[in-house]
Structure formats: structure tokens, C-alpha cells
């Protein structure tokens, strides 16, 4: 049976842990609000960029831009977006499981797969595996800005054009709400207008609603790289908001669990203390009776 002193130490440790998890929950909630505002502001722009590029890509030959060209190749790159820090529930675990499943599926089809990793958690996980990590970025979410999207997007665009890989997919957490995230596998290169923008067209956008100057081909050369930069930034913002939401939920659960443990141990402490006092009283009464 634990001593009363050990039980008091346990209660104090649980209370300290509860204070830490509660503080982390409050910090995550504040960061979530900022990240949520950013992604909600960025989504309409990213979707409109998709709409315009969809319209343009239907008017010109796909071979007019290297990022639109479909290749007959077997080299696949998978961009895996994880966090740099833990304590965010199943946020990273869901990503690495989905990424592993997708990579094995590609390999079963005879494809050669390389990885690009965003975040320390994904990097540390895949370094212990047999797959090749071509590029990695860490510290991106400390002060996330559009410059990070330019850096990541520039590297991936250049390597696609050079033929390092023939198709690019990204695995990331899409932000749905403060308590809900969804793992997404999205194809980025080559840009497939019919597949990627069908949902936008279904909302009522028609192909003849734009007039372009100077001409479609010249605008396409500018908008295709810009489109990928915007989508890369949107994906990073989605992941950042999803991470803060997952961490807030995880710390809220940890705080409540710590409270339950404190109640249980405190109750056990009180029962143990009461039993000890009762035993002492019985010893005193027994000793007094023996002296009579």
C-alpha cells in the first residue's frame, strides 16, 4: 500500500501536469483562431485561381506548359506534411499511416517512390524506414509565411520540370473544424484540369465567362506556377490550423483526464488516511483497556 506521503506527491504531480496541459490548451486555442482566420481567407482565392486555370487549360494545348504535360513514367514523389511538435493526438500518426499505405500501393504497381517531408515528426519517422527522402523542410510552422510556400513550391516545380519525378502527390491534414481534421491525398503535378477542377465547374462556372488579354497561352505561363504556389500555401495553412485544433483537443482531453486522476487519488488518499487514523485510535483504546 502506498504511503500517505507518496500519495500526496502523486496528487501534486497530477495537479502540476493539469496546469501545464490547461496552459497548452489555451495557447493552442489562441493559435487556432489566428490559423483559422488565415485559411478561411486563403481558400476563396485558391479556389478562384483553380477556376481561372481550369478555364484557361481548356482553351490551350496542354503541351504548351511543362507543368500540364502528362508523362509516361514510373517516378512518383510524395510530399508528406506533418508537424514539428507532438502532443497533438493522432495528427501525425494519421498522416504517416496514410502516407505509408499510399507509398506501398504505388510500389505494388511497379512505381519508384521518393519522399519530400515537411515537419520533424514525419522526417524522424521516415528516416527509420527504407524509402528515400529527397528533400525535407523543418521549422516551417514556427512563423509560417508565403515565403515557405515559394521555397517548397520552387523546389518541387524545378525538379518536376527537370524530370526528377513524373507525378507529385501530397498527403496532409485538411482543416474541417476545431475538433475535426481529414487526411487528404491530392495530386499536384501534372495539373489535371478535368480531375482537379470538376467540383468548381459543378458549382455553375462555365467555360465562356472570361475574356483574356493579352492571350491565353501567355497568361497560362504565368498562372500555372502561381497556382501551384497558392495551393502549396493553402496546404500549409490547412495543416497548421488542423495541428492547432488537434493539439487543443488533445490537451483538453489530457486536462480532463488529469482531473479524474486527481479525484481518484484524492479519494484513495482520504480513505487511506482515515483507515490509518482509525487504526491509531483502536491501538490507543486497546492500550487503555489493557492498563485497566
Each language-model region and where it sits:
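C-terminal beta-strand-loop-alpha-helix "lid" module of Rossmann-like NAD(P)-dependent dehydrogenases
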Residues: 1-292
Amino acid at each position: 500500500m502506498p504511503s500517505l506521503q507518496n500519495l500526496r506527491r502523486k496528487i501534486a504531480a497530477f495537479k502540476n501536469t493539469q496546469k501545464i496541459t490547461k496552459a497548452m490548451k489555451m495557447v493552442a486555442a489562441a493559435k487556432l483562431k489566428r490559423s483559422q482566420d488565415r485559411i478561411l481567407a486563403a481558400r476563396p482565392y485558391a479556389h478562384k485561381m483553380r477556376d481561372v486555370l481550369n478555364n484557361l487549360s481548356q482553351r490551350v494545348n496542354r503541351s504548351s506548359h511543362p507543368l500540364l504535360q502528362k508523362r509516361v513514367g514510373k517516378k512518383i514523389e510524395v510530399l508528406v506534411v506533418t508537424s514539428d511538435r507532438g502532443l497533438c493526438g493522432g495528427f501525425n500518426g494519421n498522416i504517416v499511416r496514410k502516407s505509408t499505405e499510399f507509398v506501398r500501393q504505388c510500389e505494388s504497381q511497379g512505381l519508384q517512390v521518393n519522399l519530400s517531408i515537411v515537419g520533424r515528426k514525419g522526417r524522424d519517422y521516415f528516416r527509420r524506414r527504407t524509402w528515400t527522402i529527397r528533400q525535407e523542410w523543418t521549422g516551417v510552422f514556427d512563423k509560417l509565411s508565403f515565403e515557405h510556400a515559394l521555397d517548397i513550391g520552387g523546389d518541387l516545380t524545378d525538379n518536376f520540370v527537370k524530370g526528377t519525378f513524373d507525378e507529385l502527390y501530397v498527403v496532409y491534414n485538411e482543416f474541417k473544424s476545431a475538433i475535426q481534421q481529414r487526411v487528404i491525398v491530392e495530386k499536384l503535378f501534372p495539373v489535371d484540369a478535368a480531375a482537379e477542377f470538376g467540383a468548381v465547374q459543378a458549382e455553375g462556372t462555365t467555360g465562356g465567362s472570361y475574356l483574356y488579354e493579352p492571350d491565353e497561352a501567355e497568361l497560362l505561363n504565368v498562372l500555372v506556377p502561381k497556382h501551384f504556389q497558392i495551393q502549396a500555401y493553402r496546404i500549409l495553412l490547412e495543416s497548421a490550423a488542423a495541428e492547432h485544433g488537434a493539439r487543443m483537443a488533445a490537451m483538453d482531453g489530457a486536462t480532463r483526464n488529469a482531473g479524474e486522476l486527481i479525484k481518484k487519488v484524492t479519494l484513495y488518499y482520504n480513505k487511506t488516511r482515515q483507515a490509518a487514523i482509525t487504526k491509531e485510535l483502536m491501538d490507543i483504546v486497546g492500550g487503555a483497556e489493557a492498563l485497566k
